[in-house]
Regions:
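Ubiquitin-like/PB1-type beta-grasp interaction modules and other compact soluble beta-rich domains
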Residues: 1-82
Length: 83
């Protein structure tokens, strides 16, 4: 499936990219792409971010096994805290 990936904050700076289209069937394959294309440090950072598919957190779905469809958007967003 052709997936649109959006990188934000420190991850975008690290990979020197904010958007790309890749082939992936689930979120785990997106993470594998990040490791192969950008290295272990990028993968480690990506796993600490909020990962959303079409605006919905993967925590509400099947986490890294969340199935993707053609045209889906996977975004890596910084987790913000407040008080």
């Amino acid at each position: 499936m052709q997936i649109n990936v959006k990188y934000r904050a420190h991850l975008a700076e690290l990979v020197k990219n904010s958007n790309e289209s890749i082939l992936a069937a689930n979120v785990s394959e997106v993470l594998n792409h990040i490791k192969k294309q950008y290295g272990a440090q990028a993968l480690k950072l990506a796993k600490t971010m909020l990962i959303v598919v079409n605006g919905q957190s993967i925590l509400l779905q099947k986490h890294f096994k969340t199935v993707l469809k053609d045209g889906d958007e996977v975004s890596f967003l910084p987790i913000c805290g407040g008080g």
